[in-house]
Amino acid sequence: GEVLSLEDEDLIEEADVLITLSNQGYIKRLAQDEFQAQKRGGRGVQGTGVKDDDFVRELVSTSTHDHLLFFTNKGRVYRLKGYEIPEYGRTAKGLPVVNLLKLEENESIQTIINVTKDQVADHYLFFATRQGIVKRTNVNEFSNIRQNGLKALNLKDDDELINVFLTDGQADVIMGTKFGYSVRFAETDVRNMGRTATGVRGIKLREGDHLVGATIVSDDQEVLVLSEKGYGKRTPASEYPRKGRGGKGIITLKVADKNGPLAGLTTVQGNEDIMVITDTGVIIRTSIANISQTGRSTMGVKVMRLDEEAKIMTFALVDAADQKDQEE
């Protein structure tokens, strides 16, 4: 892509836009008014132009002049301004993101973060890796990123980035592992480190275990966990006490043959829908409200029926309103 000079950028109207990235890697920009009209007219998620075997995994509300940071599983970060992502109509599939970003082989976008001008000074990016390593870095360390990306954190060979999220410096973080353990700690337990630092231990993993989810948590939320065999539950976040980082953690899901290992952990308000992807490529959608509220050290209840051999690989939260629109 061409690099616009500042004068050229001034010619681009500052407007609110939505950026969507589909599970199969298609990206596009939608004008906000397209989106609002689409909401009023119903149809919801179908307005995003994705095929049946795909869905919108990242939906970011931003401005044409804001910066978007794209973090990959390999710990690299790429940066685009909102206007650099091509605009498409509602029903168009979009552009393969590899056409915009110089991704390496086996490299995929894990998270997109919108950084507004007023967040640069006092906000942090919090990183969590598969091996339980965490890192916190000031957002302003990511202000000049070349087109072919930058290393956002130093990963060991067998490690990969699981999640990155923006924090205000005062948040609590919760992490969950495949064997069903979790830790919750204040983000300030992780000191601010430079961009190339490796990070510190967030959770002490048992042999063979690895991280499957990490996010910000507060006591007015619920912690949602889902197992590979389709069991799930919601638990009030207050049942997860804040401890220091680096411990072995407490049980977030009793893992047994019946329910299988933990597939993911996130926090919810309770009014969202969830999109679940199995290793056979099936996408199942259900309302969070359908998932029972139970205590922290339980097995959960069957949330969805899976084919005999299928396992849940991952899931994403989506706005529940979309579903209602489709039913009208």
Describe these PLM feature segments:
Residues 1-328:
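Short, structured "edge-of-domain" segments at secondary-structure transitions
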